[in-house]
Amino acid sequence: MRQVRRNETELRRRRWVRRLLLLFLVFALIWVIGLVAFVTRIPRGVDPNLAATDAAVVLTGGSERLEAGLELLASGHAKKLLISGVNKDVDIATLLGSLEPSQTPKLAPETIACCIALGYSAEDTRGNALETADWMRQERFKSIRLITAAYHMPRSLLEFHRAMPGVQVLPYPVFPRQVKQESWWRWPGTTNLLVREYNKYLVALLRGLVLPGDAGLAPVRP
C-alpha cells in the first residue's frame, strides 16, 4: 500500500514537471517570436522626405546622435534642439568640442545660444520622455523629431508617445557602426544588445498595461 502511494506521488510529480516544462517551452517560443517581430520593427533607414518639425530631441548615448541633431537644426528641419540626459557637469561647449570638426555642421553662435537646450534630469528612456514633454510644454511645440539609435527607437517611441499623447513624434534613427542589423544573429555582441533591448521594451510595454497612469513616475536625477 505504501509503495502504491509512493508511485502515485511520483507520477503526480512527473506530471507537474512535464506541465511546467511545457509551459516554459510555450513561453520561450512566444518570447522568440516576439524577439524576431521586435527586430523587424527596428528602422533600416531614414525617411528621405523630411518634413520640418517644431523641435528635435537627441537622446544622449553616441556622437552620431548629436551630429544628426545638429544637422537637422542647421538645415532648418527643426526650430530648436533639445539634448536630453546630459551629465550635470557638461555644457554645450563641451558637447560640441567632443565632436569631430569635419563631422559637425557650422552653427552661428547666436543659433547655439538661442536654439540648443540641454536637459539634465533624465537618467533613462522614461526620464528622457518626461524631460522632453516638460520642455515641449514650455516651448508650446506640437511636433518633434526623435533622434536615437535605431535599435533603441521602438522603446523610445513607446515612452515618448505615452508621455506626449498630443504631440507628433517622428523617428530619426542613427545607425552605430558596431551594431550589425543585417544577419544580427551571427554577431554575438549585436544579438546580446538586441535581446537586452527587447527585454527592456517588454518591461516598458507591460508597465504601461499594468500601470497606465505611471508616465509621471519616471526617475530623474536631482
Spans of model-derived segments:
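A structural signal for short, hydrophobic/glycine-enriched beta-strand patches
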Residues: 40-188
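Alpha-helical protein-protein interaction elements
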Residues: 23, 30, 176-177, 193
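N-terminal type II signal-anchor transmembrane helix
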Residues: 6-46
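Short, isolated positions within intrinsically disordered regulatory regions of eukaryotic proteins
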Residues: 20, 35, 139, 188-189
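Short, solvent-exposed mixed-charge patches
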Residues: 220-222
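N-terminal intrinsically disordered, acidic low-complexity segments at the extreme N-terminus
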Residues: 1-3
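Coil-to-alpha-helix initiation sites in intrinsically disordered, low-complexity, charged segments
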Residues: 15, 182-183, 193
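A transmembrane-helix-recognition feature enriched in membrane-embedded lipid enzymes
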Residues: 187-217
